[in-house]
Curated annotation (Swiss-Prot):
Pathway: Alkene biosynthesis; ethylene biosynthesis via S-adenosyl-L-methionine; ethylene from S-adenosyl-L-methionine: step 1/2. GO terms for molecular function: 1-aminocyclopropane-1-carboxylate synthase activity; pyridoxal phosphate binding; transaminase activity. Homodimer. Catalyzes the formation of 1-aminocyclopropane-1-carboxylate, a direct precursor of ethylene in higher plants. One of its GO terms (biological process) is fruit ripening. The lineage of its organism: Eukaryota, Viridiplantae, Streptophyta, Embryophyta, Tracheophyta. PANTHER family: 1-AMINOCYCLOPROPANE-1-CARBOXYLATE SYNTHASE 4, BIFUNCTIONAL ASPARTATE AMINOTRANSFERASE AND GLUTAMATE/ASPARTATE-PREPHENATE AMINOTRANSFERASE-RELATED. It comes from Solanum lycopersicum (Tomato). Induction: Associated with fruit ripening, but unresponsive to auxin treatment in vegetative tissue. This is 1-aminocyclopropane-1-carboxylate synthase 4. Keywords: Ethylene biosynthesis, Fruit ripening, Lyase, Pyridoxal phosphate, S-adenosyl-L-methionine.
Length: 476
């Protein structure tokens, strides 16, 4: 009997594709990425689509892009595609080795020093390029672990780690459970508990991964916590990977403390076990340039990562431009100050708007997002209830926010909402939508039911007509 067309297609796929290509570890079906799809299908626009989905699920720092644009206008020689810079075209366009342009790695090392307050020095010879922080994280994991090995990761953590750290490496991520009762702070007790669980399951634990500043919390790790964690990893002879890609987004005190400071202060810590991931995507707002950095204190890791970097090099044209820019000390200093100022102002304005509506966020001082507490809106403290609320916000309120479950949060009802990738008008419209949503929610609580405009039975918040008139008023 002939096979159906779909059966033939499935059969061919199972034969042709590798196990890697057909596994489900990438994480693209997570609500985190589903929210992006909702935005892509109906993107908000101030002129062309006022009722579209507002993108608040993308952790981009667009508040100071104008400063970058102005610098580029003033420095045409930085680009090999201008009359002023064409003299460098032949040298830059030719094949380069995997170490990167010397002027680029030197500039990166200097920039890492500046974003850490000048308290530590970085060696340009230890700077290894990668295709964004995604490539840098995967490169490190491939250097440090084998398939089946595991890394401890505090929750909540960046959803992309499932792709970056697990998908192609076969490495496991073991959660360190952090709770809202202490503002999701990492404790040694929680680390020890996660470590013991891994040991009991006969899992080989190779290291611990930190994001500092934290995505999605927007908080930083204090010096004492970093010391305790580095002592723990040192005593257990496991690696400590510190993802510091948000280092320059700290906009309020306390100041950022890099793991590099900690190991410089404590000679008992084995530096060979400590590694840093850096990037320009968040600090400068260059996610499209795909500039990721592996910085390791371990010579063998540096050498191995450099070999692997051939699969994800930063283009020499990009290196050339950034070497010019990051070597402009006056500009970099002014940019970092102004960027922090704008992030602080946007954070304060956005969280104040939420607070006026009755929504609280975890207090934070870094990053480009807030950790929003919507637990009071859940019908029950379950994952299903969180997903129902999230779908309501996506489909009816038309805001792409990310549910806490996609960050492996140990508690339901928390959502990450990004505030630095939209302009002021769009932010005001987003707040207006949230306000109307909360009014509708409060009306339900008061009257017991909210009518669905189509069938009168109830549970759908159809706010679009109200939003349309409100947004026109905001834009007037």
């Amino acid at each position: 009997m002939d096979l159906e067309t779909s059966e033939i297609s499935n059969y061919k796929s199972s034969v042709v594709l590798s196990k890697l290509a057909s596994n489900e570890q990438h994480g693209e079906n997570s609500p985190y990425f589903d929210g992006w799809k909702a935005y892509d299908n109906d993107p908000f626009h101030l002129v062309n689509n006022l009722n579209g989905v507002i993108q608040m699920g993308l952790a981009e720092n667009q508040l100071s892009v104008d400063l970058i644009e102005e610098w580029i206008k003033r420095n045409p020689k930085a680009s090999i595609c201008t009359n002023d810079g064409i003299e460098s075209f032949r040298r830059i366009a030719n094949f380069q080795d995997y170490h990167g342009l010397p002027e680029f790695t030197n500039a990166i090392a200097k920039f890492m020093e500046k974003t850490r307050g000048g308290k530590v020095k970085f060696d340009a010879k230890r700077v290894v390029m990668a295709g964004g922080a995604t490539g840098a994280n995967e490169t490190l994991i491939l250097c440090l672990a084998d398939p089946g090995d595991a890394f401890l990761v505090p929750t909540p953590y960046y959803p992309g780690f499932n792709r970056d750290l697990r998908w192609r490496s076969g490495v496991q991520l073991l959660p360190i459970s952090c709770k809202s009762c202490n503002n999701f702070k990492i404790t040694i007790e929680a680390i020890e508990e996660a470590y013991e669980k891994g040991q009991q399951a006969n899992v080989k634990i190779k290291g611990l991964i930190l994001t500092n500043p934290c995505n999605p919390l927007g908080t930083i790790l204090d010096r004492d916590t970093l010391k305790k964690i580095s002592t723990f990893t040192n005593e257990h002879n496991i690696h400590l990977v510190c993802d510091e890609i948000y280092a320059a987004t700290v906009f309020n005190s306390p100041k950022f403390v890099s793991i590099a400071e900690i190991i410089n202060e404590d000679n008992c810590i084995n530096k060979d076990l400590v590694h840093i991931v850096s990037s320009l995507s968040k600090d400068l707002g260059f996610p499209g340039f795909r500039v990721g950095i592996v910085y390791s204190f371990n010579d063998d890791v540096v050498n191995c990562a450099r070999k692997m970097s051939s699969f994800g090099l930063v283009s020499t044209q990009t290196q050339h431009l950034l070497a010019f820019m990051l070597s402009d000390d006056e500009f970099v200093e002014e940019f970092l100050i102004e960027s922090a100022k704008r992030l602080r102002e946007r954070y304060e304005k956005f969280t104040r708007g939420l607070e006026e509506i009755g929504i609280k966020c975890l207090e934070s001082n870094a990053g480009v997002y807030c950790w929003m507490d919507l637990r009071s809106l859940l019908k029950e403290a379950t994952l299903d209830a969180e997903m129902s609320l999230w779908k309501l916000i996506i489909n009816e309120v038309k805001l792409n926010v990310s549910p806490g479950s996609s960050f492996n949060c140990s508690e339901v009802g928390w959502f990450r909402v990004c505030f630095a990738n939209i302009d002021d008008q769009t932010m005001e419209i987003a707040l207006a939508r949230i306000r109307m949503f909360m009014d509708a929610y409060n009306n339900v609580n008061k009257n017991g039911v909210m009518k669905n405009k189509h069938n009168g039975r109830g549970t759908t918040y159809d706010l679009t007509p109200q939003m349309g008139s409100t947004m026109k008023m905001l834009l007037a």
